[in-house]
């Protein structure tokens, strides 16, 4: 689970050097990277070979994902899933940056001030990445606000509809903002047409995992040896549960 890849060195940000080393490791050691369709196939087939499979996910849709992460993903032929907040996405085409990206805290402040297009990807950028066959754009809701009251269904449906309309694809996966959800939210997501629901709960997924409570692992700005250790621990469900029971 990633958010930012840039040079800011801030909260939930991975530096370019470490991110490239992480992706290079996956490529060199023969890991298979998944999009949501690949992942769904594994969940639906108890006999599927899930050895050395990983899903790279990015939350929010920050512009540094396009500017820094995507070229590295292309270089190593790595698939990734981008969960985007559709009300933040704009129509200003493809941009070329010549300045450093702000920190996560600054990005959130810029979005709150109504200037999301300065720090978030555009529909054209998302469309180009989708066309590569490497990037799978899915929903992180429409507003990234606390989901309560009678607006939840509208929020989830609007996000799904925009992604399908703008990118000409099916949107059947949803990632909950801040990992906050309840049983009613799950029911509304299913009613909206989602089939895969991603959480921030730490852990490993297997063919027996629920598609409505998909776990993830936060990576962070770590070197390749620590990255390798995380992959080893969480490649086995039993070992992952034991580790998280001790260190969570």
What spans do the regions from the language model cover?
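C-terminal active-site subregion of NodB/CE4 polysaccharide deacetylases
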Residues: 1-57, 63-68, 132, 148-248
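Metal-dependent polysaccharide deacetylase catalytic core of the NodB/CE4 family, i.e.
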Residues: 2-6, 51-54, 74-182, 213-214
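Short, glycine/acidic-enriched loop or turn micro-motifs at the edges of active sites
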Residues: 62-63, 143
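Short, well-ordered alpha-helices that flank and scaffold nucleotide-derived cofactor binding pockets
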Residues: 71
């Amino acid at each position: 689970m990633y958010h930012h890849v840039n040079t800011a060195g801030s909260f939930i940000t991975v530096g370019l050097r470490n991110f490239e080393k992480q992706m290079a490791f996956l490529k060199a050691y023969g890991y298979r990277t998944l999009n949501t369709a690949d992942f769904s196939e594994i969940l639906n087939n108890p006999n599927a070979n899930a050895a050395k499979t990983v899903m790279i996910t990015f939350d929010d849709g920050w512009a540094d994902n396009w500017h820094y992460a995507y070229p590295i993903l292309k270089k190593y032929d790595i698939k990734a899933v981008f969960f985007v907040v559709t009300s933040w996405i704009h129509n200003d085409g493809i941009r070329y940056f010549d300045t450093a990206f702000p920190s996560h805290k600054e990005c959130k402040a810029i979005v709150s001030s109504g200037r999301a297009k300065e720090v978030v990807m555009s529909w054209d950028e998302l469309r180009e990445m989708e066309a590569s066959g490497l990037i799978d754009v899915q929903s992180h809701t429409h507003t990234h606000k606390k989901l309560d009251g009678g607006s939840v269904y509208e929020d989830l449906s609007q996000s799904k509809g925009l992604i399908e309309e703008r990118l000409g694809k099916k949107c059947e996966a949803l990632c909950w903002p801040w990992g906050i959800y309840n049983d009613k939210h799950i029911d509304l997501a299913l009613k909206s047409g989602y089939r895969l629901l991603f959480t921030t709960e730490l852990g490993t997924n297997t063919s027996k995992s629920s598609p409505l409570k998909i776990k993830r692992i936060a990576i962070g700005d770590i070197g390749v040896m620590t990255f390798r250790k995380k992959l080893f621990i969480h490649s086995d469900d039993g070992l992952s549960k034991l580790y998280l029971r001790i260190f969570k």
